């Protein structure tokens, strides 16, 4: 809503993401947005510390500099918009349109297979048989965590079998967890380099892959 009120209108946003729009026209819209004096306002409205804490609590900003999320998210989203195929990015579509343009954007949305998932409410310590799993994805939970909690997680994950993988992401957080994981895991740094280039979700600085020794 803030972007519509301060920068652009709904019709123009739809035109930007329409696959029938010419590259020249899309570039014009893109430059119009970037040069708009109100371009900064939506990020101030949405990503200020007060709004973030109100929604996620103060734990969400634990490792970020105070007030840094406004510029951080502006930079990330602007970089995404500047990509040649930005109109095809489902994450940008969801941000600006509120929906995906295609039902085929993610394979799991239209999978014909019967996917039965076991849902466990709680943290990783609520999973009694953690060694059963080959891949553990922690999302960006460590952005919310102090060092002691990270250490507790790593100790628990040490139960994983050799060759198992732990994946985590970092948003506005440059903490290096290597020294904590190093006791039991080997970091695959090429994973981070690859996803910094190819990730479509735009928001993250780091993508860490640790393999159980």
Protein language model regions, located:
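Class I S-adenosyl-L-methionine-dependent methyltransferase module
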Residues: 1-111
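Adenosine-cofactor binding site in Rossmann-like domains, unifying the SAM/SAH pocket
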Residues: 108-127
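A short acidic, Gly/Pro-enriched loop at the edge of an enzyme's catalytic core
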Residues: 125-137
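Active-site-adjacent loop/helix micro-motif of nuclease/hydrolase catalytic cores
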Residues: 129-130, 145-150
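Hydrophobic adenine-recognition pocket in adenosine-nucleotide-binding enzymes
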Residues: 141
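A short glycine-rich, Lys/Arg-flanked "PGG" loop and its adjoining helix->strand segment in the class I
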Residues: 149-164
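Conserved beta-strand signature within the Rossmann-like core of class I S-adenosyl-L-methionine
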Residues: 162-175
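Core SAM-dependent methyltransferase catalytic element
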Residues: 194-213
